Structure formats: structure tokens, C-alpha cells
Amino acid sequence: ELTTYKNVAVTAQFSAVDPEGDLLTYHILNKPARGAVTMPEDGSSEFVYTPYENKTGKDSFTYVAVDAVGNSSDPATVKIKIEKPNTKVTYADMDGDPAHKAAIRLAEEGIFVGECMGGAYFFQPDAAVTRGEFVAMAMNAAGMEALEDVERTGFADDVSIPTWAKPYVSSALKAGLVQGSRSSDGQVVFQAEEPITAAEAAVLLDRALQVTDVSADTLAEEGIPTWAAQSAANLATCGVLSLDGGLSAPL
């Protein structure tokens, strides 16, 4: 069952496999009542369900998969639940973005709320996430409390760590979530204002959530750094992380 929020589109995929490996196309048999389904013209299995304005409740539609010679599958049903969010936050710059639902969920949980300007909220999805920002979000997601009244973190670049981030950084260091890195002169620094890569974020979040280890033998072949492979495998197994495109880019 898919879930989304009022006035927020959700992206998903049709589920079908052709035993002969033929390309499949998809056709809607019964349209949804509370929203519309949009399918890309490239023939992929992805679709977008967009609720009608201010609609909430349960919805559904049925579809079939058709192979290259016209054989049709049995009808399948997609169920959707449109919920009213427990927050007034929706993002003006996330309309139509597949991550809009997740962004609202972060606001619901108090993990991250974007900037409010002129009465509208902006998530800034193209902005890089810094190390300091991600430490705070990961700790909030894991339900970890930050230390209070922290003036110094212990890192050599403490002066460049924002005041708001110091309790999180210090707590993360104490809990073993972060270790810092060596600067050119051999000092241990945190670099709070630098963008965090997806691989670094995976290791930090895996430690915060204390996910049970799974097999990570195949990830070295997928361009994932050895030091991040175990964490990436753990989070991918839990459905927290997608490994498409590797983990080297900034988050």
C-alpha cells in the first residue's frame, strides 16, 4: 500500500516480471477516484500518483502488464492512502519532487524543517547537506539526545563549528558516531561546514541506528568504498538507502 500526504504526489513502480525478459508496458484498467496516475512516455515501470486537491482517505486503481506480443497479465491493484500531515509544513520548491513526501515526514518527526520565507517553506533540495547538519538530523532520527551547554567539542577546528552544532558534534564524538579526520598538519578536525558524502552519511547513520550487520560481499564491485560497504549494505537491506549511482557524491 502506498501512502502520501494531502496535495503531495507519490512516485512508485508497477510490479511485473516477464519470464522471457521481454519489455513490458502497463495499462490502467480502473482509474483511481481521488487522484490521477501519470506514466512516463519512456516505457519504464515508474508511475506518479497525484491526489486531487485537498483529497484524503483511501484510493486504488488496477492495471495490467502487456508483453511485446500482446499477452496481458492478470489485473493487479495498487492501494493508496492519502493522509493529512501532522504538520503545516509543505514545501513550495518540492512540488512534483519524488522526495516531497519524505521531506514532510522529516518535518513531522522534528528531524528537519526547511526555511520559512514570506509565509512559504523551502526545502532547498539541491543544496548540499553539511557534516554538522547531518549529524544533528541523524541523532534526532535515532532519538539520541545532545549534550547541553557544550562550548568546546574537542576537535582542532572547534572555532569553525557553529554554536548550534557543537552539542550534536560533541555528543556524536562521545557516542562513537564520528571520529573526525586528519588535517594537513596532523590535527583531528571535523569540518562541520563541509558537504557530507552519501558514503560518510551512511556510516554515521548506521552507527546511530545500530543496524544489525548483513552480508556486504558484493558491494565492493558497485563502486562503494570498502570502509562504507558494511554500513551501505545494512541500510539498503532496511530500505533506508538506495545504492543506485554509488555513494561518492555529496548528499
Spell out what each predicted region is.
Residues 46-56, 123-125, 190-192:
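Extracellular/luminal low-complexity segments enriched in Ser/Thr/Pro
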Residues 1-2, 81-100, 113-135, 139-167, ...:
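Feature responds to low-complexity, polar/acidic, surface-exposed segments characteristic
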Residues 27-45, 112-115:
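Low-complexity "stalk/linker" and mucin-like segments enriched in Ser/Thr/Pro/Ala/Gly
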